[in-house]
Amino acid sequence: MKTRINDSIQQHQVYPCSYTSIHIVDWKKFTSENLKVHDRVPVNPNTGKLIHSVCLRNDSAMSILVDAFVENALQYSKKKKARQCECVIYPDNYKDTDWVLFVEMKYAENEIAAFRKENDYPNNMIEQIKQTVQFFKDKCILPQEKEVYAIVSFPNLLSAFNSTIFSIDAINDFYLDYGIIIRGTNNAEIISSDNIKLIG
């Protein structure tokens, strides 16, 4: 998987990790840095406050790779690019039967901002996930029939928000149409190389 990604995507940063608690933060809103991976909730150096994250519970300390995309990384050609999510995550010794998780994050300050109609964050985030997964399949990074997981995350929202974004029918339709198991959540649990649970 890593080799196939490297062959198709030049602008990306890979973070190997085996933390039992994996915290993924998009630093663009806080500093000039991009996405980073931490073993604990990080602190904003400008304010001293904790920064909320996407958290992956990894009790077995399994080795995984978090592959973060630089802006405009998914290029079909010089003139055509795919919209992209923040990162893709997968087991270090990936096999095609293993799970793959795509993550898109928005640091909306509160629920009102997250779901304000004119911002249209949920639909934009879902489209970024769809186009990223399609790029991976178009470039043969993933098989066309591969089922994948996806998280639409609002790290600053501490209460459950999946049902605000997706009805049960919408989740089922998304899976049937695109082969993507998607949830609105900030949390997941890595069970094994072929099993991951989206919490929310």
Which ranges hold each PLM region?
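Basic, amphipathic N-terminal segments that precede the first structured/catalytic domain
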Residues: 1-82
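Electrostatic, structured charged patches in enzyme active sites and in nucleic-acid/phosphate-binding
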Residues: 59, 63, 71-74, 141-145, ...
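Conserved catalytic cores of phosphodiester-cleaving nucleases, focusing on short active-site segments
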Residues: 87-89, 99-111
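Short, flexible/disordered intra-domain loops and linkers
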Residues: 112-121, 160-163
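Catalytic cores of nucleic-acid endonucleases
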Residues: 116-153
